[in-house]
Amino acid sequence: MKEYDKCISNTENLLRINPNNSDANYYLGLCWYNKGLDYDATLIPDPTSKTYKENKKKVNQMFEQAMPYLEKFRAARPDDKERWQAPLYRIYFSLNLSDQLKKLEE
């Protein structure tokens, strides 16, 4: 069973104690990212549907929640590309953040 909310709560508590804990930043970002991916996977693709568009906004909001934590992890551990690159790429692509996307591709 996926317990994203529990993971989010626990890692937020860790970050209150030590905001620079790179692993806690990574896992909090990853929780939000995976929660967004899982929610997105439940949607029936219909770009003309108002409900679909609203639900895609929810996915993007989860990605927006994930982004600062994954970026903080990236700044702390730039050589750990295999952990931060794919999630950030997907987030930047989904949120249409072309400048950030280009920086990842450099």
Task: Give the label of every model feature segment.
Residues 17, 76-77:
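Structural marker of alpha-solenoid helical repeat scaffolds
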Residues 13-14, 73:
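Canonical positions in the second alpha-helix
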Residues 24, 83-84:
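TPR alpha-solenoid repeat register
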Residues 21, 80-81:
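Residue-level recognition of tetratricopeptide repeat
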Residues 1, 29, 34-45, 94-97:
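Short coil/turn linking the two alpha-helices of tandem helical-hairpin repeats
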Residues 34-69:
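Short coil/linker segments at helix-helix boundaries
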